[in-house]
Amino acid sequence: MIVSLKEMLQEAMKGQYAVGAFNCLSLENVQGAIQAAEELNAPIIIQLAEVQFPCAPLSLMAPQYLQAAEETNVPVVVHLDHGQSFQTCADAICQGFGSVMFDGASLPFEENIRQTNEIARMARACGVDVEAELGRVGDVGVDDASKDVFTDVQEAIRFVNETQVDALAVA
């Protein structure tokens, strides 16, 4: 059963549990992830990142994600992970994804806010939840432990207040 990201995260906060998010590059990956969620009777986020499009095109994967999510009895969010542009987020929404993540972490802070707001306006008009990113999540090497890659708490508060995103990935 397809649910919204916001709804799933609110339930997880109430129940004090985490929700697994899995990038799936094939129908077999999608089926395996959902089967595991069914066996555990657990909610799940199945997601596809823009960097994976060369081997798992959005137009081919979206129908598989959506059908698998509709056919199960566990809550499933179908999510775009690390979308790099307005167009990518719009494409995922047009394909039926109920949640998109805009990754503007490499942008200057003010530009990240501006672009996130643009995407959030479009997504909200379509009833789609939005996640954004601050800091360098998943982009830090072992030798790169500098404090400047971590999310500043005050920036995160300001970012969420100005964008009203449903979720925020922080480093």
Regions found by a protein language model. Give the residues of each.
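Alpha/beta enzyme core
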Residues: 3-11, 25-52, 58-75, 83-171
